[in-house]
Amino acid sequence: MSDIKEILSKYKTIAMVGVSNDPTKASTIVMKYMQEYGYKVYPVNPRAEGKKILVQEVFAKISDIKDQIDIVDVFRPSKEVYAIAEDTVKIGAKVLWLQLGIRDEKAKDLMEKNDIKYVENKCTKMEYQKYFLKVRQAFPVLSD
């Protein structure tokens, strides 16, 4: 089993950092999708603290969440990742997941030192679809 498939099978609680209250943003679409497939997703956005996104209370930072977090899923620029990685270690999360286009070598090293799984430049929604949903290819009907 691949590491990603194992992560998505084993861990079901996600702190999603950088979720927007705009329903057209990728972060909100991914959050809704993961909720629909059985994941408990906590939105983290300091600008929306105390509000609700997709019926979930929004937290300012991951350390404000009282429940145990398995995956910290990041929708923030790479330059902000290391601070989030430090918080990931502090809360005892099992995985730091960086969305498409996001990378941080120092964060990767920190995760390795603390035995925390690290995924970069991958979308949780797309990876879930790849491993767990066998979508039939739709072909257009051709006519004369």
Q: Where do the PLM segments sit?
A:
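ADP-ribose/adenylate-binding Rossmann-like module
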Residues: 88-111
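Structural motif
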Residues: 70-71, 95
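Glycine-rich, highly charged phosphate/nucleotide-binding loops
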Residues: 51-67, 73-83
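A charged, well-structured terminal subsegment
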Residues: 125-144
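NAD(P)-binding Rossmann-fold cofactor-contacting core
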Residues: 22-25, 31-52
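Conserved beta-strand elements of the Class I
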Residues: 15-17
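Short acidic, glycine/proline-enriched helix-loop-strand junctions
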Residues: 66-67, 105-128
